[in-house]
Amino acid sequence: MDPRSEKIFKAADYIKERLDGRVPVAGIVLGSGLGKFAEKIENPIVIHYKDIPGFPVSTAIGHKGNYIAGELGGKFVIAMQGRIHYYEGYPMDLVTLPIRAMKVLGISYLFVSNAAGGINFDYKVGDLMIIKDHINLLPNPLIGPNLDEFGPRFPDMTHPYDKKLIAKAKEIAAEAGIPLREGVYIAGTGPSYETPAEWHFFRTIGADAVGMSTVPEVIVARHSEIPVFGMSVITNAAQKEFAADYKNDGDDVVKAADAAADKMTYIFTKIIESL
């Protein structure tokens, strides 16, 4: 067996032992500032990344580094309270190991969330954006020998985000009076924030929001034909002109995401309830 697969199955076996034979219907990835989403999970089973054999550990601001398994929307789910980023120095097989492990656990759906910078001038801080498509500027996690037990060598990416889940989210948000955006997310390596020229370039090629994560997770999920729903919290607004004292700040990103967390939690919970 490929050493990467061995690591995935070893991690999954450790997690399985703590789930008492229960199979999660969905995996959820909680981005910067969205960790309190996990507080909504009932009868939680907490599994620390640092205790899982061969597992990477989150070092980013606002990422605690736990799996939380339990009940959400009447369904058994497993959530990542903190993700792994490429900019932390991990290779892509470790960045995506948590998603692969959840695949082995038996998830049928993947929900991903992130804090993202607004590129579209219409977007405001605190807006929720459904991710309808993405642009990847990170290394592709499928580079290297294919893991045949997870999917084909050349997976199709025509529909990276599930249209039925998107339609359900819009229906739920409309009923609750929660305004939603829908746009294209572009993922860069980070950890430096974007220059004004890069923001202009990203807007020119069709991106609406920018971040440093999510896309590798979506690629490996789709490699295994797992339906994906993605949502961004816009944590800073696009600037037509950058003031002399303008500055991106990680703490501000976390605060803005935290302020929108309840709305995102409601939408995710209601979708999961409907599965």
Name these PLM-found stretches:
Residues M1-M157:
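Metabolite-binding pocket within alpha/beta catalytic cores that recognizes anionic/polar moieties
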Residues Y14, R18, K164, K168-P179, ...:
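Generic non-transmembrane alpha-helical segments
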Residues K103-V104, R203, R222:
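Non-catalytic positions within long, well-ordered alpha-helices that form the structural scaffold/packing
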Residues S108-Y109, D208, P227:
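Short acidic/polar active-site loop segments enriched in Thr and Asp
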Residues L147-I186:
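Metal-dependent peptidase/peptidase-like ectodomains
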Residues I172-D208, L275:
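Active-site/ligand-binding-proximal alpha/beta "capping" segment
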Residues M212-D251:
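Zn-dependent metallopeptidase/amidohydrolase metal-coordination segment
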Residues Q239-L275:
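His/Asp/Glu-rich mid-to-C-terminal helical/loop segments that flank catalytic regions of hydrolases
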